[in-house]
């Protein structure tokens, strides 16, 4: 991993702030044609509490700042040989040890890129209560994921850049200094966060199965793909399942079955 990093920051009159950063990263985990990525971010903030129109409120509003930032950063494959086809040993052929290909090469593998917008407020009241609020939206492009392959290929999956995903949410933190003396202090901290996740686009297929999860356009990345449990038969205690068989019109039946192999996953 090699990185070149630079940043510029500017502040004026303790009220207005701006920043810019840039980095260029190169990694041997990617092929020579795709291993370099350019990432950047811009930010700005306005300290309202320093403005003259806030003077009448200075005993209440100790500090207040509005923040905004936008930028892109990158993620690498977790493995060292993501773009290589690799071999392993341990099998025997005609009594002789033999290597075999256990991972398929992907020379087009590239950086996963996150485009993030963040808007925030920092607020201090009575010099005792501090509130931080952030709203964000993050779009991930060239999403890194193991895509399942047809078994006729001889491989189970391939690591590839499959599409686009979006996260949107907010974070709130409230901190208070309730008691502050020489011998005793009492502070309180509360936080709340919420995130909504959705796969926007998949490259080749509208959906594919990944273990007990389904990766599907319009659904969360962590959408579970299992047989639907219908409870326990009160007569004999056997587990029951909804069959969820789909007809030609796309409607699913809700018949009860006892063998999980007779039920479709949803």
Write out the residue ranges for each language-model feature.
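Surface-exposed extracellular loop regions of Gram-negative outer-membrane beta-barrel proteins
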Residues: 62-109, 137-161, 200-203
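Transmembrane beta-strands of outer-membrane beta-barrel proteins
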Residues: 18-20, 59-68, 119, 131, ...
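Repeated loop/turn-to-beta-strand initiation elements of outer-membrane beta-barrel proteins
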Residues: 15-18, 51-54, 127-131, 170, ...
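Outer-membrane beta-barrel signature, preferentially recognizing the C-terminal barrel domain
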Residues: 1-5, 91-130, 157-181, 218-223
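Transmembrane beta-strands of outer-membrane beta-barrel pores
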Residues: 22-28, 48-50, 70-74, 135-141, ...
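Flexible, solvent-exposed coil segments and beta strand-coil junctions
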Residues: 1, 17-26, 48, 94-102, ...
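Conserved small-residue
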Residues: 160, 179-266
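Membrane-embedded beta-barrel scaffold of Gram-negative outer-membrane proteins
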Residues: 111-154, 186, 193, 197
